[in-house]
Curated annotation (Swiss-Prot):
Matches recorded under Pfam families: FrsA-like (PF06500)
Extent of the signal sequence: none
SUPFAM superfamilies: alpha/beta-Hydrolases
EC number: 3.1.1.1
Matching Gene3D superfamilies: alpha/beta hydrolase (3.40.50.1820)
NCBIfam families: PRK05077.1
Record's protein name: Esterase FrsA
Length: 414
């Protein structure tokens, strides 16, 4: 089946698809607080989703392209779930968030199919994959159209990987008690086995969102990157997120001695946002298998246990948390009680001495991850490093922070 035909088949109207903002039905929705964060973007009046321009641009999307798609959504006269929120158009049609971003992705997919230069074609496929992922954002469970966009993103990503520098292998990992999961091993040029970073992504992202991290920061240092999806999304959708948040990554880590391209004696973990919860758990539970753990904007304690902090978090992010935990109909109070159990301090891990070297990067006044969480991580490590990243200029400092973090990882792996 051709890629174009796959698009037509997946998105063929069959029934009235649920609109994304209605999928999580918490009872006491509050007023939307204004929020701005380097890793998560910012809340903009009249939008349900947080608009994450920095990360989308970092992944290769032109700022003008973002504005063009937003404009098409804003200008739509189609029926909305909430007339006050632009991105709540019902059904797969003009103005619907998933429709508009997927339509934009198809433009690049078509360019990729007609481009004769393999490397340029690979770039176009990667661009399409990123746009399909934005279409599926924030990846709530039960969002049928978003899941179809994710399937197209994965297909486009596989096409891109065949044409871009280095080698990518799609790998299947067995997890006892449930379905196997699929990961992507990205390898630089040269002969393996390679020192490897196990990527632990945020809850509102897919594993295919981190190619820029590999290409710009790890590959030039001769380091491979292994990604898997977080529980309940993408290739890990059959697994629910539980208090044992590192379960899937742990099984992958244990399987690495059997992967010939990976030097299993030189492995680090890198966690973005809630992925840091996974990475820090691994630092405690699998310290003999890890040379280092790095975190960026970690969600390990405060957001999970502090009611005031939770009140400052946008509606969409609370919906993401509820969706991952399988609590689609929960009140905020029930969600709060459950989230507290995910705190690594409440679990009795953070605060205890950990032999694994740990670095944690943070931004001042980050609504998702206060400085205290990063201090808790680094002070718990026998070899801890705290890294403050200034907010402005946001893109340049984000790049500088990642350079420093990957340099720190390289010293411990190579």
């Amino acid at each position: 089946m051709t890629q174009a035909n796959l698009s037509e088949t997946l998105f063929k109207p069959r029934f009235k698809h649920p609109e994304t903002s209605t999928l999580v039905r918490r009872f006491n929705h509050g007023a939307q607080p204004p929020v701005q964060s380097a890793l998560d973007g910012k809340t903009i009046p009249h939008w349900y989703r947080m608009i994450n321009r920095l990360m989308w641009i970092w992944r290769g999307i032109d700022p003008r392209e973002i504005l063009d798609v937003q404009a098409r959504i804003v200008m739509s006269d189609a029926e909305r779930t909430d007339d006050d929120l632009y991105d709540t158009v019902i059904g797969y049609r003009g103005g619907n968030w998933i429709y508009e971003w997927a339509t934009q992705a198809m433009v690049w997919q078509q360019k990729a199919c007609t481009e004769e230069d393999p490397q340029l074609s690979g770039r176009h496929w990667l661009h399409a994959a990123t746009l399909y992922n934005i279409a599926a954002y924030p990846h709530l469970k039960g969002d049928d159209l978003a899941e179809q966009a994710q399937a197209l993103s994965n297909r486009a990503y596989e096409e891109a990987a065949q044409r871009l520098p280095g080698t990518m292998r799609q790998m299947e990992f067995t997890v006892p008690g449930g379905a196997p999961i699929t990961g992507f091993l990205h390898m630089p040029k040269g002969d393996g086995p390679f020192p490897t970073v196990l990527m632990c992504g945020g809850l509102d992202a897919m594993q295919t969102d981190y190619y820029s991290l590999y290409e710009r920061y790890f590959a030039p240092r001769g380091i491979a990157m292994l990604t898997i999806d977080m529980p309940s999304v993408g290739f890990s959708s059959k697994w629910k997120l539980t208090q044992d948040s590192s379960l899937l990554h742990q099984h992958v880590l244990k399987a690495l001695p059997n992967v010939p391209w990976v030097d299993h004696t030189r492995v680090a973990a890198f966690g973005f946002r809630f992925g840091a919860n996974v990475a820090v758990r691994l630092a405690y539970l699998e310290s003999p298998r890890l040379k280092a753990v790095a975190c960026l904007g970690p969600v390990v304690h405060t957001l999970l246990s502090d009611f005031k902090c939770q009140q400052q978090v946008p509606e969409m992010y609370l919906d993401v948390l509820a969706s991952r935990l399988g609590m689609h109909d929960a009140s905020d109070e029930a969600l709060r009680v459950e989230l507290n159990r995910y705190s690594l301090k409440v679990q009795g891990l953070l605060g205890r001495r950990c032999p694994t070297p740990m670095l944690s990067g943070y931004w001042k006044n980050d609504p998702f991850s206060p400085e205290e969480d990063s201090r808790l991580i680094t002070s718990s490590s026998a070899d801890g490093k705290l890294l403050e990243i200034p907010f402005n200029p946001v893109y340049r400092n984000f790049d500088k922070g990642l350079q420093e973090i990957t340099g720190w990882i390289e010293k411990r792996l190579c």
